């Protein structure tokens, strides 16, 4: 696959996220994809990744990745890298790492969001997601959860 094709697929992926088009989102990942998020163990498999994506939308129903245009978007070989503005409002329940419910704060967040993805046969096989989790939690008035 060409770098240009991978860049187009990356935009399609974020379009699917923003539209909550989970069928397209799933089709752009290999079944055995590995996804790394800040402050959690890697997610293995598209079914688990789709569940966590749907969960995130329940906690932040208006979350959005600004990908038209991206702040940064480039490719090298099988890899793509994107940086986008990521926004949302905490309107639903979150579950902390200990399994406790965190009620909605109704606070907004805005952070840069970076995705570094490796593509094979038009699908992501490895996805690394980076964003300022501490900054996000501060904006949501949830810094006490970081201690």
Where do the model's predicted regions map?
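C-terminal and inter-domain tail/linker signature
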Residues: 1-147
